[in-house]
Amino acid sequence: MATGTDFFDQATIVVRAGNGGNGAATFRREKYVPRGGPNGGDGGRGGHVYLIADPEYNTLLHFRYQRKFVAENGGHGGKNAMHGRNGADVYVPVPPGTVVRATINGVTYTVDLARPGQRLLAARGGRGGLGNIHFTTPTRQAPRLAELGEPGQELTLELELKMLADVGLVGFPNAGKSTLLSVISAARPKIAAYPFTTLTPNLGIVEVGVQRFVVADIPGLIEGAHAGVGLGHDFLRHIERTRLLIHIIDAAGVDGRTPWDDYEQINTELRLYQPELAQRKQVVALNKADLPAAQANLPILRERLPVAPEDLFVISAATRAGIEPLLQRVAELLRADPPPQRDPVDPDEPPLEWPLPPVDENAFTVEREGDAFRVRGVKIERLIAMSNLEQDEAIDRIQRVLEASGINEALMAAGVQDGDVVRIGRAELVWDDSGQHAL
């Protein structure tokens, strides 16, 4: 039985990884050891958020009902050097063929989840904070210093499903694509006599004997679509992964256009958008043959269209005339061009990650920010995020790092003055002439 399905091909979701657990500042009870000696354990890692290509899904419809995915926070460290529990990871299923985009530090990155089982580490869980057991020194035997957990990553993801249909129906608006799909499958697309009735693809499963294939009624195309006019790119991006195109032409010219010009214009738009699309195998269906105007145009179309006779069909989607030979030819061409096999990913294969450029974690920048100064750098901002700014020992640690890393020197070179505000991450420090900072 032929079947149809709704199609939901774009979605925006938010993924938030878990925060790392806090390190513990605890002490064991032992005679002659100051405060019993530190024994605070480390916090656990926050849970990651993964996207996984799941062949059980063929649209992004499930994101209409849930758009935010949050992983578990890591557990806090405990006494006796007990390590906090790692937060549970979250796996978000998407259909194979989903393209994922995220903007990180002002740059947009793209990952393609094409193969079943492929995973993307979409949001990384925060590191657990170190317990006070790590901060003993010869001069500080009983530190109360412990780190906070690192915040988990939070990103907004743009998802786009590049359709995996076998056959795409292309043509001008109102050429009869939706009517044809409703005839050859159980899909029930919206059909009406005005342009852009189809705003999103409709999928239908077609059976020819024992052979089954997926046909997509793709939004209608107009002149300038390659530049985004009309539904433009929303039309063209859907056909990139189809193996075969059925090019439907209104042979009667009901909308006042000439059918042979329609044929040329569609192929021009395909070529301008992506040259290889114009080379993709097509069969041409001259539709609306039940109308007298179509019958008058057929001899001209047969003469003018550069289409082999075996790939040119006269049909009427309204009366179903000529449909069967068309489908037989489509099935034959698909058998001759089987889809590439996408083997499932080995479960032990590491997940994909955002293709971020290498970063020097020790690097930093100092710049004016209004009347204040802003310090940016991976390592120093992480230190601020994982420090309890109400602890004197944490502030002392920050001061030592600012001095040792050269940030203090860079601030003085930038012209910092007594009383100026210095912002690092969430912290606002005030410069004094001795080179020290205070909250």
Swiss-Prot record:
Keyword Cytoplasm tagged: yes
Binding residues annotated for GTP, in chain numbering: 171-178, 196-200, 217-220, 287-290, 316-318
Residues holding Mg(2+): 178, 198
Location of the OCT domain: 356-433
Residues annotated as domain Obg: 5-164
Requisite cofactors: Mg(2+)
Similarity comment text for this entry: Belongs to the TRAFAC class OBG-HflX-like GTPase superfamily. OBG GTPase family.
Physiological role: An essential GTPase which binds GTP, GDP and possibly (p)ppGpp with moderate affinity, with high nucleotide exchange rates and a fairly low GTP hydrolysis rate. Plays a role in control of the cell cycle, stress response, ribosome biogenesis and in those bacteria that undergo differentiation, in morphogenesis control.
Name this polypeptide is given: GTPase Obg
Lineage: Bacteria, Bacillati, Chloroflexota, Chloroflexia, Chloroflexales
Name of the gene this protein is made from: obg
